[in-house]
């Protein structure tokens, strides 16, 4: 990364890495949560993984939005992945070559429209993400944080710690992680 920056200082470079060591985030490194399965369970686990990385000081974390392995995707599941990923520091929709690609137009009109709305929201947030990418973490609030950061002593918050996140400083999102939930909750 440092070599690329010296080669062309006008550009900002980043890499997506499977591993991490302290200090990498200053170089533009992005961590992702690995090759996860296409499932509601995997979607439900991602907020906790992302929050853990952020609490450890890693500013940019992503996942294979939609899941990577398996053919269990449904229009509703993929829509929920898109809606969750639209608010993450890095949105990376990705799947195995053996799976149906996670393109909105392949999942029906209603799901495709909902996924496009999530993508449009993501595009509206691009200036914010670019500003965060250009500003070192100590000089700005984290992009993602737990809602309960000040209430660790209260027992009722322990379970929520893995699923609720405050994104983009002022937006609060709890991603839908079960099929019965029909919309992203906003608090």
Where are these regions (language model features)?
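Catalytic-domain carbohydrate-binding cleft regions of carbohydrate-active enzymes
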Residues: 1-187
């Amino acid at each position: 990364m440092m070599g690329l920056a010296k080669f062309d200082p006008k550009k900002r470079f980043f890499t997506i890495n499977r591993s991490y060591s302290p200090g990498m985030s200053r170089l533009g490194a992005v961590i992702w949560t690995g090759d996860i399965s296409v499932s509601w369970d995997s979607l439900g686990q991602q907020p906790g993984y992302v929050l853990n990385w952020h609490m450890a000081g890693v500013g940019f974390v992503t996942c294979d939005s939609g899941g990577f392995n398996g053919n269990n995707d449904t229009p509703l599941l993929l829509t929920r992945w898109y809606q969750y990923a639209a608010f993450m520091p890095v949105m990376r929709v990705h799947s195995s070559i053996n799976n149906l690609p996670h393109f909105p137009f392949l999942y029906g009109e209603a799901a495709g429209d909902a996924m496009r709305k999530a993508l449009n929201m993501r595009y509206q947030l691009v200036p914010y993400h670019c500003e965060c990418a250009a500003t070192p973490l100590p000089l700005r609030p984290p992009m993602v944080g737990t809602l309960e950061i000040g209430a660790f002593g209260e027992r009722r918050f322990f379970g929520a710690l893995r699923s609720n996140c405050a994104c983009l400083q002022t937006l609060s999102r709890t991603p839908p992680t079960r099929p019965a939930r029909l919309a992203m909750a906003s608090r």
